[in-house]
Curated annotation (Swiss-Prot):
One of its GO terms (biological process) is peptide biosynthetic process. GO terms for molecular function: translation elongation factor activity. One of its GO terms (cellular component) is cytoplasm. Coiled coil: none annotated. This is Elongation factor P-like protein. CDD domains: S1_EF-P_repeat_1, S1_EF-P_repeat_2. Belongs to the elongation factor P family. SUPFAM superfamilies: Nucleic acid-binding proteins, Translation proteins SH3-like domain. Pfam families: EFP (PF01132), EFP_N (PF08207), Elong-fact-P_C (PF09285).
């Protein structure tokens, strides 16, 4: 696939690795006879290591077929996380090192997960934009401090720690943005 045909989300092979394109910058310098250059910000699959590379418009990058299978988190088997395909109930096992920091957002029965599969092998997961987690430990609200919105630390049921508004109490369910790791509101 030529560099000028690549779109965000495409999965390509580069330098012996497999990468997913996350961002594209196009530049056409005036002094080079109109040769358009593309700068790709891509992340390795699996692993998520960031790579920044530039290509000419006619550079060729082989495209890799990546399937995204909607799945539900099932259980943890030793150090591996097991996800169940929502359509055909295929179990996908991914090691804790592949899941990485996303493990802090995964709870029993979590739905809306996409397992990324290359050649029938699960290589990565894509979590929903927000997940609902329970606050298990946070300091009480300070009386008289309502004029300022000071955040306070809160430990969640998965072990994750985030900053929450003062009015959040122990036992409350909160929405957490899986991209930024920040408080996104109260859960219903």
């Amino acid at each position: 696939m030529k560099a000028n045909d690549i779109k965000k989300g495409n999965v390509v092979e580069y330098n012996g690795g497999i990468y997913q394109i996350r961002d594209i910058e196009r530049s056409s310098p005036q002094g080079r006879g109109g040769n358009v250059r593309f700068r790709f910000i891509m992340y390795s699959v699996p692993g998520g290591a960031k790579l920044d590379a530039s290509f000419d418009a006619d550079d060729n990058l082989p495209e890799v077929e990546l399937l995204r299978r909607q799945s539900t988190y099932s259980y943890k088997d030793g150090e591996a996380f097991v996800f169940m395909d929502d359509e055909d109930y295929t179990p996908y096992m991914l090691d804790a090192e592949v899941i990485g920091t996303d493990a802090g957002y995964i709870t029993d029965g979590l739905t809306g997960i996409f397992v990324q599969v290359i050649d029938d092998q699960p290589v990565a997961v894509q979590l929903p934009q927000t997940v609902t987690l329970e606050v298990v430990e946070t300091p009480p609200e300070l009386k008289g401090g309502t004029a300022t919105k000071r955040p306070k630390p809160a430990k969640l049921n998965t072990g994750l720690e985030i900053m929450v508004p003062e009015y959040i109490t122990n036992g409350e369910r909160v929405l957490v943005n899986t991209t930024t790791g920040e408080f996104a509101g109260r859960a219903d």
